[in-house]
Amino acid sequence: MYNVECIPIKDIKPGLKNINVIFIVLEVGVATVTKENREVRNFKVGDPTACINVSIWDEPGKLIAPGDIVRLTKGYASIWRHCLTLYSGKNGEVFKIGEYCMVFNESVNMSEPKRAEQQAVANPAATPAGLPAGGGAPGLPAKGGATGIPQPAVAAAPGAPATQSAVTTAPAAAPAIAPQTTTKPGTRGGRGGGGRGGLKGERR
């Protein structure tokens, strides 16, 4: 299909000149008349590698129909309305060399606008937003204790024994002892007892 002079459509790039290519016409667009009273027609054409939009000036554009196999020489490619377009040059020629018998590829459209892909810059070393510095889950405290309760820092001198918390216990109260009362035997006075005996002794 391609000789030394012709290139496949997939290799056409913006700014490329002296393009020689063979393609089959797929669609014919509406003619546009310029201020210089020149007529230009847009075509969608394809070959086995890709398809592209072609603008052909003046009389050759009027003679081309869908299904024609065309050889275009000394064309150039540029961007028009964000689309890659192939143009017939002033010194170029357009030849019809056949009809219908050509394989073409429409899945690769060189004239589709190329949208710039936005790439998100991810920094794996950065701490994700919303996570605490300790690495815990959002809403949970980092290692060390519950939220809002400060943990005491205990610093021990090197070589000192571990300090144990001293617990002071209050001494147990002694059981209360009830006071004992001493009862002395009462002395009978008057007539009874020793007084009476004494009197008897004196009488004897």
Swiss-Prot record:
- Tell me the InterPro entries matching this sequence: NA-bd_OB-fold, SOSS-B
The record's similarity note reads: Belongs to the SOSS-B family.
Residue ranges for the region (Disordered) are: 115-204
Q: What is this protein called?
A: SOSS complex subunit B homolog
Q: Tell me which residues form the DNA-binding region.
A: 24-94
GO annotation, biological process: DNA repair; double-strand break repair via homologous recombination; mitotic G2/M transition checkpoint; response to ionizing radiation
Keyword terms, alphabetized? DNA-binding
Q: Where is the composition biased (Low complexity)?
A: 122-131, 139-183
Q: Which CDD domains match?
A: SoSSB_OBF
- GO cellular component terms, A-Z: cytoplasm; nucleus; SOSS complex
Offer an example of a GO molecular function term for this protein. single-stranded DNA binding
Q: Please tell me whether the keyword DNA-binding is annotated for this protein.
A: yes
